[in-house]
Each structure stands twice: as C-alpha cells, then as structure tokens.
C-alpha cells in the first residue's frame, strides 16, 4: 500500500502522526540504550511519507539520549514534538505548548513523605531530574537508564514548579504513595518505582495537546509502547501497537502486538499497517 494510507479491519485511514515511548520501545536495554538499525530506517521512511514522528515518554528533557534529542543520520532534525514527563511538558522547535506542573500544596505533601523516610524519590523540574539520595534503588535505575542523578534538597526545589515525582516503591508498596497522593495519577513501567503526575496530566492528554498544536486529529494517529504507563496512550490513539516485550496491560490495550524492540518490532508493525515500504 502506498504512502501513509493504511487499511485494517476498521477501514482505511490516513495516519499523520506517530507517537513513541522511549525505554523498551525505541531504545533497547540489550544494546546499551541504542535505537536498533531497523527502527532508524523505519523512522526515516515514516518521515519521508509525511508522518510526524513524536516522542511520548516519562523522561524529562534532561534525560533524553542524544539520539532522541538530536536525531541521527537521515533523521537530522530530531523528532517533530516531545511529550515529556508523562505529558506534563510538551514542546517542539517553536517552544513549549503545554505546561502542567503539580499543584504546590500537593508537591509539598509528597516531599514531606520523602523527608519522613517513607520512600526515596526523584523530582523532575525544568532544570532536570534529581534524587533525594543515591540509594541502592536509585543506583539500580541509573544502571537501567544509563544516567546519573544529582542529589538535591527537595525542599529547596519547591521554590519552582515540579512536574513529576518518581517514588521508589514496589507494586505491593504503591499504596504508600496513593494513600497520600490520591489527587495525582500514579503509573509505572517497571517494578522498581512508580511515576506521580498531576491529575490533569497524562500521556493521552499530552498527545491531545500535541494534535491541537499540529492541527491533526486523533483518528490520524498511531502509538507504540511497552510499559504499563503506555496502556492509556495505546488505547487513546487510533492505532495502538504494543511491543513484544510489553507488559500484559499494555498488550491488552493495543490493537496490535508486534515483536520485541530487538527483533525489528517497530519496523514490522509499520510495515504491517502499510506505513513504510
């Protein structure tokens, strides 16, 4: 099928925007956090066919790998839009078009829990991502994402907007966070920690803001993800694709399950829908 028309059981559609999670979707843990060659080729083709390629991640800008921020040969202008911090900040080359910080009182409540020793955490603001201390759980995440978090006094950080917290609690311990942060959305993509974002923020809301900014509709979208925090995004977009290495809830929310990130998953799915040659 030519161009970016795709025909499925739901009919013929014109896909004009593709949204990609980063960890486990674009980047592989098995290849030193690099984008597989087949995915690079697929992204180049997708853009050549007129499809906007957008990032939709829990990561902040400061934690985006160079290949995501700056692009790569054949994909030199980087991505067309960046939905970061689980939808709390969205921007493109023209600037920030969506900015949703956590309410100050709610942020203070979370920091009090950290100071009381309930759990360790990360704090995400415009300047970067910081930890309250470099505990073993923090170091484990650093190894997973190839990034070292600077230590910051969270109380001092409250002088400016906070967009997301990450609480180092297991799924069984998650109630320790939800009990005191019931007015926030709590998601996770691994067992090590959960993300805490404003109730007015999410990956789908970030996509909605991006579509409005680009002048596109929800019916013109495809999304790729692998984590539990991608499930709502996969359900929201016209076509949701879960990676073969995805969590069960991500797969349940998807229209199509492709192969693993390391097994040409993105390229195979785009080819399945006729979006690349």
Regions found by a protein language model. Give the residues of each.
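Short, hinge-like loop/turn segments at secondary-structure boundaries
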Residues: 70-74, 98-101, 138-142, 205, ...
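Short, structured coil segments at secondary-structure junctions
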Residues: 78, 86, 180-183, 236-237, ...
């Amino acid at each position: 099928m030519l161009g970016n028309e795709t025909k499925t059981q739901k009919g013929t559609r014109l896909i004009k925007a593709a949204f990609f999670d980063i960890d486990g979707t674009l980047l592989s843990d098995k290849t030193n956090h690099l984008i597989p060659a087949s995915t690079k080729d697929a992204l180049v083709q997708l853009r050549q066919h007129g499809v906007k390629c957008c990032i939709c991640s829990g990561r902040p800008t400061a934690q985006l790998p160079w290949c995501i921020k700056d692009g790569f040969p054949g994909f030199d202008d980087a991505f067309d839009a960046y939905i970061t911090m689980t939808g709390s900040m969205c921007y493109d080359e023209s600037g920030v078009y969506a900015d949703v910080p956590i309410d100050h009182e709610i942020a203070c409540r979370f920091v009090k829990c950290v100071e009381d020793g309930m759990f360790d955490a990360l704090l995400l603001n415009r300047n970067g991502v910081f930890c309250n201390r470099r505990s073993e759980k923090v170091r484990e995440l650093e190894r997973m994402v190839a990034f070292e978090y600077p230590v910051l006094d969270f109380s001092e950080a409250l002088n400016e907007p906070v967009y997301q917290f990450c609480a180092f609690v297991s799924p069984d311990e998650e109630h320790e966070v939800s009990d005191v942060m019931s007015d926030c959305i709590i998601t996770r993509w691994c067992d090590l920690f959960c993300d805490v974002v404003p109730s007015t923020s999410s990956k789908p809301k970030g996509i909605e803001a991006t579509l409005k900014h680009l002048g596109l509709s929800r019916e013109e979208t495809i999304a790729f993800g692998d984590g539990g925090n991608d499930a709502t995004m996969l359900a929201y977009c016209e076509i949701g694709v879960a990676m073969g290495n995805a969590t069960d809830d991500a797969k349940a929310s998807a229209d199509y399950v492709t192969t693993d990130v390391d097994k040409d998953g993105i390229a195979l799915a785009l080819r399945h829908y006729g979006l690349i040659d």
